[in-house]
């Protein structure tokens, strides 16, 4: 299992700082530009990266991320080409933690074990699958087994309306970090959920999972700073999607 995320969070915890973990789609608009974007993000202070693999039916994404995926796909983006961009990035950035974010079809089609190993070989540290339900991970252990065998973290998502019982279940599954949604629904809107982030973070702390990373795809990037203070080990921001 890679230790890049663990080492990053340990350093940040000592300084009581949150991580800046931006999200971008790989191969948008093409592999060369995509690689340059990753280089620029790290040079501009990104502590880690969440990298999307474009999909034709991004059910959880808003218009900006969907348009990004469409551009990449129109120029021939495939999972293999995306992993090649990551592989090239890794040659010059061996210490930057990277989580791949993609939809379940892109993992299931080649086979869970085959994909997980390919992702690890390309240099990924973690995989986040937004449409992989907690119940499926519990019923089909192949998902977690394949990730562990490849040396990858399989990150779990905590929705803002999660009950205490559900938070505990998710905390028992997640690896690497815990992805805390800041709102219910399609990303890129600016509507707060009814559940205060502080309550979810307290529940996570009681369950003692991996560090929470609060996802902020809000039109207001300043919201990430506030969440970082509530979840000091990790916080992230992405452009409105």
Name these PLM-found stretches.
Residues 2-12, 31, 56-67, 74-89, ...:
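Active-site-adjacent beta->alpha loops and helix N-cap segments on the catalytic face
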Residues 10-14, 43, 87-94, 120-121, ...:
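Acidic (Asp/Glu)-rich catalytic clusters
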Residues 20-24, 49-51, 98-102, 127-129, ...:
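Hydrophobic faces of well-ordered beta-strands that scaffold small-molecule active sites
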Residues 22, 41, 49-52, 119, ...:
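Conserved, mostly hydrophobic/aromatic
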Residues 31-43, 162-173, 208-209, 218-235:
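Catalytic cores of alpha/beta
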Residues 46-56, 125-136, 178-189, 230-241:
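Glycine-rich phosphate-binding active-site loops on the catalytic face of alpha/beta enzymes
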Residues 92-133:
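Hydrophobic alpha-helical segments and helix pairs
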Residues 179-182, 188-234, 240:
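Active-site/ligand-binding-proximal alpha/beta "capping" segment
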């Amino acid at each position: 299992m890679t230790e890049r995320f663990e080492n990053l969070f340990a350093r940040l915890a000592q300084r009581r700082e949150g991580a800046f973990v931006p999200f971008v789609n790989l191969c948008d608009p093409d592999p060369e530009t995509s690689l340059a974007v990753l280089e620029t993000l790290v040079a501009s202070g990104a502590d880690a990266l969440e990298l999307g693999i474009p999909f034709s039916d991004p059910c959880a994404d808003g218009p900006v991320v969907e348009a990004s995926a469409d551009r990449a796909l129109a120029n021939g983006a495939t999972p293999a080409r995306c992993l090649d961009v990551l592989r090239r990035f890794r040659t010059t950035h061996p210490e930057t933690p990277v989580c791949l974010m993609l939809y379940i079809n892109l993992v299931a089609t080649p086979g869970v074990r085959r994909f997980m190993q390919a992702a690890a070989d390309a240099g990924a540290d973690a995989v986040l699958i937004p449409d992989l339900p907690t119940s499926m991970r519990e019923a089909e252990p192949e998902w977690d087994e394949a990730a562990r065998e490849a040396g990858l973290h399989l990150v779990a998502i905590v929705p803002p309306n999660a009950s205490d019982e559900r938070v505990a279940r998710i905390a028992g599954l997640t690896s690497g970090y815990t992805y805390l949604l800041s709102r219910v629904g399609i990303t890129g809107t600016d509507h707060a959920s009814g559940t205060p982030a502080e309550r979810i973070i307290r529940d996570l702390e009681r369950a003692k999972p991996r560090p929470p990373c609060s996802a902020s795809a809000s039109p207001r990037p300043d919201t990430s700073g506030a969440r970082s203070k509530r979840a000091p080990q990790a916080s992230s921001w992405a452009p409105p999607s």
